[in-house]
């Protein structure tokens, strides 16, 4: 089946698809607080989703392209779930968030199919994959159209990987008690086995969102990157997120001695946002298998246990948390009680001495991850490093922070 035909088949109207903002039905929705964060973007009046321009641009999307798609959504006269929120158009049609971003992705997919230069074609496929992922954002469970966009993103990503520098292998990992999961091993040029970073992504992202991290920061240092999806999304959708948040990554880590391209004696973990919860758990539970753990904007304690902090978090992010935990109909109070159990301090891990070297990067006044969480991580490590990243200029400092973090990882792996 051709890629174009796959698009037509997946998105063929069959029934009235649920609109994304209605999928999580918490009872006491509050007023939307204004929020701005380097890793998560910012809340903009009249939008349900947080608009994450920095990360989308970092992944290769032109700022003008973002504005063009937003404009098409804003200008739509189609029926909305909430007339006050632009991105709540019902059904797969003009103005619907998933429709508009997927339509934009198809433009690049078509360019990729007609481009004769393999490397340029690979770039176009990667661009399409990123746009399909934005279409599926924030990846709530039960969002049928978003899941179809994710399937197209994965297909486009596989096409891109065949044409871009280095080698990518799609790998299947067995997890006892449930379905196997699929990961992507990205390898630089040269002969393996390679020192490897196990990527632990945020809850509102897919594993295919981190190619820029590999290409710009790890590959030039001769380091491979292994990604898997977080529980309940993408290739890990059959697994629910539980208090044992590192379960899937742990099984992958244990399987690495059997992967010939990976030097299993030189492995680090890198966690973005809630992925840091996974990475820090691994630092405690699998310290003999890890040379280092790095975190960026970690969600390990405060957001999970502090009611005031939770009140400052946008509606969409609370919906993401509820969706991952399988609590689609929960009140905020029930969600709060459950989230507290995910705190690594409440679990009795953070605060205890950990032999694994740990670095944690943070931004001042980050609504998702206060400085205290990063201090808790680094002070718990026998070899801890705290890294403050200034907010402005946001893109340049984000790049500088990642350079420093990957340099720190390289010293411990190579």
Curated annotation (Swiss-Prot):
Q: Does the keyword Hydrolase apply?
A: yes
Its EC number(s): 3.1.1.1
Q: Which reaction does it catalyse?
A: a carboxylic ester + H2O = an alcohol + a carboxylate + H(+)
Q: Which domain of life is it from?
A: Bacteria
What keywords is this UniProt entry annotated with? Hydrolase, Serine esterase
Q: Supply the InterPro entries for this chain.
A: AB_hydrolase_fold, FrsA, FrsA-like, FrsA_esterase
Please name the SUPFAM superfamilies in this protein's record. alpha/beta-Hydrolases
What are the protein's GO molecular function terms?
Answer: carboxylesterase activity
Q: What does this protein do, in the record's words? A: Catalyzes the hydrolysis of esters.
The entry sums up its family as follows: Belongs to the FrsA family.
Return the protein name.
Answer: Esterase FrsA
Lineage of the source organism?
A: Bacteria, Pseudomonadati, Pseudomonadota, Gammaproteobacteria, Enterobacterales
Q: Which gene encodes it?
A: frsA
């Amino acid at each position: 089946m051709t890629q174009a035909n796959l698009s037509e088949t997946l998105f063929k109207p069959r029934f009235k698809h649920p609109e994304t903002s209605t999928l999580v039905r918490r009872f006491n929705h509050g007023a939307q607080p204004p929020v701005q964060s380097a890793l998560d973007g910012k809340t903009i009046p009249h939008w349900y989703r947080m608009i994450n321009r920095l990360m989308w641009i970092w992944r290769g999307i032109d700022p003008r392209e973002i504005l063009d798609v937003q404009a098409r959504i804003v200008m739509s006269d189609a029926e909305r779930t909430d007339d006050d929120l632009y991105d709540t158009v019902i059904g797969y049609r003009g103005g619907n968030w998933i429709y508009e971003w997927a339509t934009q992705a198809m433009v690049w997919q078509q360019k990729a199919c007609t481009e004769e230069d393999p490397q340029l074609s690979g770039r176009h496929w990667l661009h399409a994959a990123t746009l399909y992922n934005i279409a599926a954002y924030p990846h709530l469970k039960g969002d049928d159209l978003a899941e179809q966009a994710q399937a197209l993103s994965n297909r486009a990503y596989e096409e891109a990987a065949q044409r871009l520098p280095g080698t990518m292998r799609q790998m299947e990992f067995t997890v006892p008690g449930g379905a196997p999961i699929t990961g992507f091993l990205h390898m630089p040029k040269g002969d393996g086995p390679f020192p490897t970073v196990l990527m632990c992504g945020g809850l509102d992202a897919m594993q295919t969102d981190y190619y820029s991290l590999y290409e710009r920061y790890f590959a030039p240092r001769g380091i491979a990157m292994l990604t898997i999806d977080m529980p309940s999304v993408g290739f890990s959708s059959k697994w629910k997120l539980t208090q044992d948040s590192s379960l899937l990554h742990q099984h992958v880590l244990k399987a690495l001695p059997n992967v010939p391209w990976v030097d299993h004696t030189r492995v680090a973990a890198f966690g973005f946002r809630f992925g840091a919860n996974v990475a820090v758990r691994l630092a405690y539970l699998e310290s003999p298998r890890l040379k280092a753990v790095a975190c960026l904007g970690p969600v390990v304690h405060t957001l999970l246990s502090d009611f005031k902090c939770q009140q400052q978090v946008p509606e969409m992010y609370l919906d993401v948390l509820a969706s991952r935990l399988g609590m689609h109909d929960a009140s905020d109070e029930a969600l709060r009680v459950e989230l507290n159990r995910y705190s690594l301090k409440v679990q009795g891990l953070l605060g205890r001495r950990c032999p694994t070297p740990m670095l944690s990067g943070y931004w001042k006044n980050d609504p998702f991850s206060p400085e205290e969480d990063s201090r808790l991580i680094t002070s718990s490590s026998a070899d801890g490093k705290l890294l403050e990243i200034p907010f402005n200029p946001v893109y340049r400092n984000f790049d500088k922070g990642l350079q420093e973090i990957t340099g720190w990882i390289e010293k411990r792996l190579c």
